[in-house]
Regions:
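Active-site neighborhoods and metal-handling regions in enzymes and metal-associated proteins
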Residues: 1-210
Length: 210
């Protein structure tokens, strides 16, 4: 799958991918930067893609997670919806003069509350076992452009929006990542055309299962 994506990007005339494509299924998706991409995909697995391309030397960094058999299980759906809620909320509130640290604190609270309500954790502090990276980083000429997390975001900065949850005990790793263009009072989702709603993913998988 990694090779197919990389080939497609180059075949479309784009520059080489800006970082090694991640195509992680099952428990491998609970490893943040898994890149071996050499395991067999089991029927009930989710597969997590973290991938990108370059355009005029600027990087894109996108993640999507979907069920390889086309249907989310009940538990997969529960965890996915928690991550999706965080992703949507960060997109909704991100704007100039906020800091990445502020976005991270909001993201952690949403994920912790969701997991607590779903009985996936017993205390909000446990969220650190299942979410252990930043919700955002600066994107530009490099996939991770240098940026201080306490620095107010300027207008026209581009940042990632990538909440995730990783449960090794269930073999479930989910990350949903978009690229946001920061404006004065809002953010523009540059990757909004890439589907991420459960109903859209399942519909797409059903339509293309052959």
């Amino acid at each position: 799958l990694e090779a197919f994506f990389d080939y497609t990007i180059k075949d479309e005339g784009n520059n080489p991918v800006p970082f090694k494509t991640i195509a992680a299924s099952g428990i491998n998706a609970t490893t943040l930067h898994y890149s071996s991409n050499n395991s067999l995909i089991n029927d009930n697995d989710l597969i997590l893609f973290d991938l990108g391309c370059k355009y005029d030397n600027y990087c894109a960094d996108i993640s999507r997670t979907f069920p390889i058999n086309g249907k989310f299980s009940k538990l997969q759906k529960t965890i996915y919806e928690i991550v999706l809620k965080a992703n949507k909320q960060i997109c909704k509130i991100a704007k100039a003069n906020m800091t990445i640290r502020q976005l991270q604190e909001i993201c952690i609270d949403i994920l912790a509350t969701g997991c607590l309500n779903a009985s996936l954790i017993k205390d909000k502090k446990e969220i650190s076992k299942y979410y252990f990276h930043s919700v955002s980083h600066s994107i530009g000429l490099d996939t991770h452009d240098p940026f201080i997390k306490d620095t107010p975001l300027p207008v026209n900065a581009v940042i990632s929006n990538e909440p995730g949850l990783y449960f090794k005990e269930y073999g479930i790793g989910i990350r949903i990542e978009d690229d946001l263009l920061i404006k004065e009072n809002h953010a523009i989702n540059l990757s909004s055309k890439i589907i991420k709603e459960i109903k859209d993913i399942e519909k797409f998988m059903e339509r293309n299962k052959d």
